[in-house]
Amino acid sequence: MGYIATTMSNLLHQTAFLNLTWGNYVMMLVAFVFLYLAIKHDFEPLLLVPIAFGMLLVNIYPEIISDITVDILGVEHAGGLMHYFYILDEAAILPSLIFMGVGAMTDFGPLIANPISFVMGAAAQAGIYVAYFLAIAFGFNGKAAAAISIIGGADGPTSIFLAGKLGQTTLMGPIAVAAYSYMSLVPIIQPPIMKLFTSEKDRKIKMEQLRPVTQLEKILFPIIITVVVCMLLPTTAPLVGMLMLGNLFRECGVVRQLTETASNAMMYIVVILLGTSVGASTSAEAFLNVDTLKIVVLGLVAFCFGTFGGVLLGQLMKILTKGKINPLIGSAGVSAVPMAARVSQKVGAQADPTNFLLMHAMGPNVAGVIGTAVAAGTFMAIYGV
């Protein structure tokens, strides 16, 4: 009987029930909420499902992301499964591969046809710099503030990339979760701001059809952008270079297999690895603290200011072009592709169902992807990374 009792006691102590804290249960509840939003309400399911499941796993079994250890005899013990996934985040491998996949799926035609979209895409990065100074005011050091501020660009991979490059790995989980959460909430956060700073007359403005873009222009675009941006800011090469390489695969027309692989199989594999590893970085000990709350608030402020900056410049462009530009497309300058462009289309269609703004909004939207990468490169240059 003693043996059986001891065995049962040992088994009981090996279960998660006796080893988890209240914080773990809170994080498990957050994971369930994310899964509900992703599955029931279709809030960015490709991102939220793996993130939520990684969050669930690490709070049931924290050792799944444990580091490699060496015992007193010098014997090395392997780390947890998610530790090896997470190394790919810290080394900026997964974010860069995500950018390649995004490039392979993106049509830069609307941006080429309307180069002024570059300016609106840049204006929507205002939230990044507002958040940077606010984060410093909140007590974060410069590198942490820079990593947090990228949330304002609504760009998860760039947030992870910069946090890793600046050595802010302890903040990577909260930053990534905040960035992806706000990306999924674009249709909820942006419309009130867009409507507040535009009149119904503004929202009804119809824009002229974009000019056709030649194949040669589409081929030259990624090459020129790579040379110009990477010469000015070499630190952007991993992100901008991979983004433009993926786009060159798409547009050159001679590497169909590479285009299909980059935009489908590789992209989804990387999303699984990135999502689960980011989710697994949100253990209760790492996530439930005051810094996380600050990051969530700063991220929301940054995102709102980014939307405001885009709409404000859209209003300026409307005045300069004598009413030829609908200011709603400015809000699409955040790099949540293509969600932000769809929101511009939806808000415009609410004012006038015959108004079709999607392709016009895609210009600032894809410009925002480049703009966020440039902002990250600027911070890396400032801090000598």
State the predicted function of each range.
Residues 32, 110-132, 283-310, 361-365:
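Entry/N-cap segments of selected transmembrane alpha helices
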Residues 178-254:
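Membrane-embedded hairpin module used as a gating/binding unit in multi-pass transport
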Residues 1-19, 25, 71-78, 192-221, ...:
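Intrinsically disordered, low-complexity non-transmembrane regions of multi-pass membrane transporters
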